[in-house]
């Protein structure tokens, strides 16, 4: 579970950046 969170963190960050780009 911990590893999944670590992997999802950058993914969510990237999505946040994409949304900000819109």
Curated annotation (Swiss-Prot):
Subcellular location: Secreted
Family from the record: Belongs to the frog skin active peptide (FSAP) family. Rothein subfamily.
Modified residues (Leucine amide): 22
Species of origin: Litoria rothii (Roth's tree frog)
Name of this chain's protein: Rothein 2.2
Keyword annotations of the record: Amidation, Amphibian defense peptide, Secreted
GO cellular component entries: extracellular region
Alphabetical GO biological process terms: defense response
């Amino acid at each position: 579970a911990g590893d999944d969170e670590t992997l999802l963190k950058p993914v969510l960050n990237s999505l946040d950046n994409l949304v900000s780009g819109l």
